[in-house]
Amino acid sequence: MSNPRHNEREVRSPRGDELNAKSWLTEAPLRMLMNNLDPDVAERPHELVVYGGIGRAARTWDDFDKIVATLKTLNEDETLLVQSGKPVGVFRTHKDAPRVLIANSNLVPHWATWDHFNELDKKGLAMYGQMTAGSWIYIGAQGIVQGTYETFVEAGRQHYDGNLKGKWILTGGLGGMGGAQPLAAVMAGACCLAVECDETRADFRLRTRYVDEKTHSLDEALAKIDEWTKAGEAKSIALIGNAAEIYPELVKRGVRPDIVTDQTSAHDPVHGYLPIGWTVAEWRAKQESDPKGVAKAARASMKVQVQAMLDFWNAGIPTVDYGNNIRQMALEEGLENAFDFPGFVPAYIRPLFCRGVGPFRWAALSGDPEDIAKTDAKVKELLPDNKHLHNWLDMAKERIEFQGLPARICWVGLGDRHRLGLAFNEMVRNGELKAPIVIGRDHLDSGSVASPNRETEAMKDGSDAVSDWPLLNALLNTASGATWVSLHHGGGVGMGFSQHSGMVICCDGTEDADQRIGRVLWNDPATGVMRHADAGYDIALDWAKQQGLRLPAILGN
């Protein structure tokens, strides 16, 4: 019997200004869905896998075809409903309603486990959407580069007087998310040693210039790091190996990185983490024949790696969990002090979230890189005093290879996002850009996620697990007129550990779009300021007052 999730076809998004659908509001999700499966973008496009273990864009290839066909015929007053990658209904709504509403991987809490999800997945009843895979706004590794860069820069400020020259970062994983780490480290001025078990992933990062060199030898990797740090160079190297074996070996040798983290796909014990002593081929085969055995071996290996990370932490080396839930896995394996070292959000990112600052991203539906160059210039024009952001845009232009449709990410917050969106829409209207722009974000944002082991770890008021906030965010984005809105479960940290929402809005140059953009790109980050103000963060309370937010039970207005 053929596998409904495997097809050798090659999918690429259309380019240019010719419509395949009835309007740009349906053309936009069509192109971004297809862009998610572009072989230059997705990790395993023939299996519909975009990134993050088994994060898919559609449940089956038949579902993909039906989504495409439906988007091509969808009217301006209709909304498509997508349930875990399957197009289940089209309903009449109105012109300002979202054209697509997506719910992926959501399970009733008591049943929200990998075992139960995998049973449903095997029966074809569910799909893991990760964050931006099933919500059709993944832009390749660039999507996480700036967030990782901001994290490393802040770590440098806190631990090394703001200077990472001559320092090096140890990490693991070069997949769709982890692949950003070597480039982000270099941009921040540091060297990076990234351990990756799957050589094809390392080769992909080499081709796209996200990593500088590759080796199979730990000794060679360490020699290179020593050479570069002594010379004050910022370069990166991928070491083909297993992080669960390499990290303890480094501890044993007394090697001292300057920062330690990890971004393997530990959130998914079956599909995301290679057990100690296994080959990649053996691992792939047993994912199908013995998934529970794989998970058991992977969890035991994660415990070994986390113990090594604790050893680094106890030796005084800054060590953080980069949001893959590896500490939780180790804790469940009996490592009682697994959470002694912090997650990256409470350690470095939360002050940004308090101002609604997060991963604002956009893609040029024209396919023309010049459209991104023009929008980069517009960002600089509208935010003239944000020199840190200007520096990021300059580095991104020089170092980041576009994957699929040209795109850009830059971290901006409440008060700036709507200004940029309206400016982009005006550029489409007056012909400066060759086709419309879509604006979206990662689900990792200030008001759109509840994830007690990542984005909402160690909240000031103890509200880490309260998931009303992403639900309210999705509802408000729907009411505000986003072009498509998504509500997912389990992204980043795995089943049972997160709920999160996403939105995308199309700048098609119309005056109607001005109204939608103004609402969505104000309200979306405002929910993040609201959420953090409610938790008692002074930065968020001050920013809410400064921006004139009406928060009755929080500000008394």
From Swiss-Prot:
Pathway: Amino-acid degradation; L-histidine degradation into L-glutamate; N-formimidoyl-L-glutamate from L-histidine: step 2/3
EC number: 4.2.1.49
Start and end residues of each stretch annotated as Disordered: 1-20
Single GO term (MF): urocanate hydratase activity
GO biological process: L-histidine catabolic process to glutamate and formamide; L-histidine catabolic process to glutamate and formate
InterPro entries (UniProt xref): Urocanase, Urocanase-like, Urocanase_C, Urocanase_central_sf, Urocanase_CS, Urocanase_N, Urocanase_Rossmann-like, Urocanase_sf
Annotated compartments: Cytoplasm
Gene3D superfamilies, sorted: Urocanase like domains, Urocanase superfamily
Similarity annotation: Belongs to the urocanase family.
Role, per record: Catalyzes the conversion of urocanate to 4-imidazolone-5-propionate.
The protein's name in its UniProt record: Urocanate hydratase
